[in-house]
């Protein structure tokens, strides 16, 4: 048999003929499924009965599919109908006929198959249904996902730190360029200077350092004779210069603000003395103002 189910499908874009108007109302079409069943032959609007429900049928269908691996809709539905017939015979209480009739069972099986297909648990080729397997979500998978996430987060943090370092380096270079331009304008600039990049070695002023340089100037051997030392690149030095400049600007700004505050207070006090009719120099003594 063939199964027909009525669906409302909104029409897709159609080529419009100049003399024909296309209606935008939903078009009723019929979905025909070759499964030799009578699912959907019941009247529209008939409610499904409660009871085991789709979940119960889904478990049974899943067990059948997993056991058979390759099967058909008709084979699965027939076996489940047979199983329910056996249950009905052995049941102490009579079962709901509407819930466990053949048409209702086939409809439930069909709904379960559609759900499994949407979840990629099964694959369907015409009438043949092939079992693909349930999604695997175990503790091991969760731990692997967490490890991958930690690796990604660590990589992001390293890249963020590297980006911050690059920004600081660019800012330091821009500050150095501005400083050099000002020096050239004011003092014509120094006769000699350092070129970038460079390396700075820091050690004790009294340390004895033995230096050997190859003839091609490509290899340098340094022996500090067990004296502690540090190696700094140009980026580190530029960063220190930038921090020093910012500190100087901060101190200068703070000093200027403090000076302006004192000048404003003195001017206010002097005006107060004139307004009161007194004259003479203003003297500061432990925060008090005296006039003579």
Curated annotation (Swiss-Prot):
Assembly, in brief, is: Heterodimer with E2F. Interacts preferentially with E2FA and E2FB, but also with E2FC.
The protein's induction, as recorded, is:
Up-regulated by the transcription factor ERF114.
Write the record's keywords in alphabetical order, separated by commas. Activator, Cell cycle, Coiled coil, Cytoplasm, DNA-binding, Nucleus, Transcription, Transcription regulation
Question: One GO biological process from the UniProt record?
Answer: regulation of cell cycle
Which protein, by its recorded name, is this? Transcription factor-like protein DPA
The entry's DNA-binding region feature spans 51-135
UniProt keyword Transcription present: yes
Ranges in coiled-coil conformation:
163-184
Q: Where is the composition biased (Low complexity)?
A: 252-280
Q: What protein family does this chain belong to?
A: Belongs to the E2F/DP family.
> Which Pfam families does its entry note?
DP (PF08781), E2F_TDP (PF02319)
